[in-house]
Amino acid sequence: FPWNLWSYSWSWLVEIIQVLNPIGLYAFNSISIAFFCSPVIFFFKSKYKYFVFSIFLLIFFSFYIFGSYKINDDRDMTRDIKKTVYVKVISPNFDMRYIHTDKEIKETIKKIVRYSDPDPNRETIFIWPEGIFAGIYFEDLKKFSNIFNKSFSKKHLLIFGINTQDKSSNEFYNSLITSNNNLDVLYKYDKKKLVPFGEFIPFNDLSEKFGLKKITQGYGSFSKGNEQKNFILNELNILPLICYEIIFPKLTQFSDKKTNMIVNISEDAWFGNSIGPHQHFAKAIFRSIENNSYLARSANKGISAFINNNGKTIKRLEPHESGNIELDVPLINNNFKNKNDLIFFV
């Protein structure tokens, strides 16, 4: 469970962590553990202790030099790219609650539209967070498609989180939906990595007999999504990740090599006033570097941001901050991304 790895302590120094791209998270984590533990050698009587410690300093100095060169090289490359896609990330700062009545649904839609501030004449991809439509399913939202049609134009595309149901199998999913302004589904991604006791109960049938249920609404568990596939909007090749899927490097390593942007939607209200939203955000920085891709993150009561392919935060909204941020995302040529952690296992 890669949440508090030692390597995440470097998230503030993007030059150092550029090495994630060629060697991967777990190899870098092993080197970081060795480095942070290396001062212990000074408690031993050895004539090699200064030499060994100097080797570790030299390794991380070389990481810094490599990272600085890569960042400058990528900056020059990005400056020459003419083709961009306009994206808006919205952070509504909604309280964590379930909506049920038509009145509550309409109020929620109107608020998210206001924060989106759509320009009818400009092609835009809007990204809304997970959890804003908690308590309803996509079919319930479809009843209000007339509001979406009036609020957004044909030049607008929407990405948001909502629960969905497969009526043929009676399975329920935590999904990311991509739609037009009529709420016609263009793409649907069902979350693969579910949160234990939050989205599913292990040994569900047995647990129900003892009255155990999720900490979220209801007894039933969500079903796991079957596959992870990129989708393309306005020439932008997008990899979708829902909530804490962002902490798993494997999900980005085996994605489409031509990924231009990772989209991460999240409900961070669970963390409350803790360090959780900041820890959650740090993982997104690492994924952007490993994947050599831009990353757009929309988090309710978390950190919403645009991160470039070097892990630099271009724009951000803090936890409990409402509004939107916008960026012309360049269609970078993704020549190389970390595909695995073979170096770690070697």
Where are these regions (language model features)?
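Enzyme catalytic cores with a strong preference for nitrogen-chemistry domains
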Residues: F1-V346
